[in-house]
Each structure stands twice: as C-alpha cells, then as structure tokens.
Amino acid sequence: MKGIFNAKIAAEFTPPKTWVLQKPLSFSTRLLAKNEVNLLRQIGVNVSSHKSLVMGKVTCVEGMQTDLASVPRIVWAVISPWDVARAAVIHDHLYASLRKYFHSFNSRKSEWRRARKLSDNIFLWGMQSAEP
C-alpha cells in the first residue's frame, strides 16, 4: 500500500456533474520527500508533514467541489470510478491548486511540470491504495 485515506467519501451530488464534500478527506503517504511537501505547500495545496512519521498528508476541506473520476461509463467494467473516487478527489484538489498558483504567478514551466508529475504520482499512489 502506497498510502492511507482517513475515511470514505461523504459527498452530496449537485447536478449536472459536481459533488461537494460533506467532510474533509485526507491521503497520507510516506513517499513524499521534504522538497516535494514544500513544492505542494508553495502551490497552495493543503499538505502537512509529520517529522516523527516522515509522512506527508494532503487534505481536501469540507465544501470542496469535485467531479470525482471523470471515467467514461463504457470503461467502468475495467476501472470503476467508485474504486478510485477518493484518489480522484485528492487529485482534483492538487490540480485546482496547481492551476490557481500558476495562473496567478506565471511560474516557470519546469516548476509546472514537476508539480504536475508529483500530483499525478499522488493520484497513482491513491489509486494503488484504493479499496472499493
């Protein structure tokens, strides 16, 4: 397991395709290096680290809007969006922070690529840690 979620998703559907978190959702992993935690903080991600545990925790706040996993229905037999929904919510938070930061500060493309790759890795670790 690459990490652990704090809870199951508690979200309310708001048409046409948005869900609103009813309580915070976190993903903790030991795979984040200190410089990666710092990069996530820099772009505005709600991330904390625990020195004693050498662990990073990304948290989505209550009220955050998400589309969950935008998985086409035809692919559900292979990858159900419900199996990876928590990872998708974390990924949505990461990408929303990423877009907001880079549109506001026009940062270098190398930072953008590094932050995007890290966000995608966290999504992958979350999917690998998913339980239906």
Describe each PLM feature range.
Residues M1-P132:
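Extended terminal accessory/targeting regions
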